[in-house]
Amino acid sequence: DADVESQAVEIGQALTEILKMFETFSSPLTDILDKLPTPANRRVARARERLDETIYQIIDERRSSSEDRGDLLSMMLMAQDEEGGGGMSDDQLRDELMTLFLAGHETTANALAWTWYLLSQNPEAEAKLHQELDTVLGDRLPTMDDVRRLEYTERVMTESMRCYPPVWVMGRRSIGSYKVGEYTIPAGSIVLVSQYVMHHNEEYYPEPFKFDPDRWTAENRASRPKYSYFPFGGGPRLCIGEQFAWAEGILIIATLAQRWKMGYESKGPVELQPLITLRPKGGVKMKLERR
């Protein structure tokens, strides 16, 4: 197999370089600047080549083995076009896998960083989390079968993404003319919708800046309208990786919190850095203490 784990540091660095490129997209000069042979553009080109090399290697090895591993790549390799009957090309598979790398790396890392920070600032919630993990897991590592049983762990992750949604704003094109209050949005307009703003709306979330995982009990969830919470977007363009992200996040939180307490090392609150994702400015430096 393509040894992705041994290349994790290099792949992570390549992803970071490519994500930096997206931060310049709001500039009116983007179309011009992207074509110049600047050091930044050369770094992005090298990073893209590095990711392509790894991804095409994975695809080639999977095609050669013809093994169904029950994962997303196996599903895509077996997918057939309903009309033509053909499968996905290597380039199509590459595009899908690149999306998973880019969308799944930065967003999940940010969600987990904010979660550790919030738990370090809310010892009562952290204690409840530890209690659930001790009860459900004992000394064994969590598995996929445990995801549904780790209800409080899921509430912790849900509330973390309410407080600090990794994707804090998204754009949608209006398919028709629509009136909002005194304003008319013409058909074809690009409308920016902010998860961060909606997730801090006091109408739906009293004390919106308070970290409270119990907002997400079944009863409390039922009291709020559907799109008062949408960290993964919604509708036909809902994030394709949502279910994977939930399972991945819950299992990582459970695995680490089962054995460690996280202490926030820096002085003062974390500053927000709203780029293409909502990052903690300068990162979040944590101290691990064995439970």
Predicted features, each with a name:
Residues 53, 57, 140-181, 202:
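Conserved cytochrome P450 K-helix E-x-x-R motif and the immediately C-terminal K′/meander segment
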Residues 1-110, 128, 277:
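Cytochrome P450 heme-thiolate monooxygenase catalytic core
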Residues 98-99, 103, 141-145, 169, ...:
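Cytochrome P450 heme-thiolate "Cys pocket" and heme-binding signature region
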Residues 107-132, 243-259:
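Cytochrome P450 catalytic-core helices
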Residues 193-221:
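Conserved cytochrome P450 K-helix/beta-meander segment immediately N-terminal to the heme-binding cysteine loop
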Residues 13-16, 134-142, 148, 238, ...:
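Cytochrome P450 proximal C-terminal region
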Residues 40, 44, 153-169, 282-291:
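C-terminal domain-closing interface element
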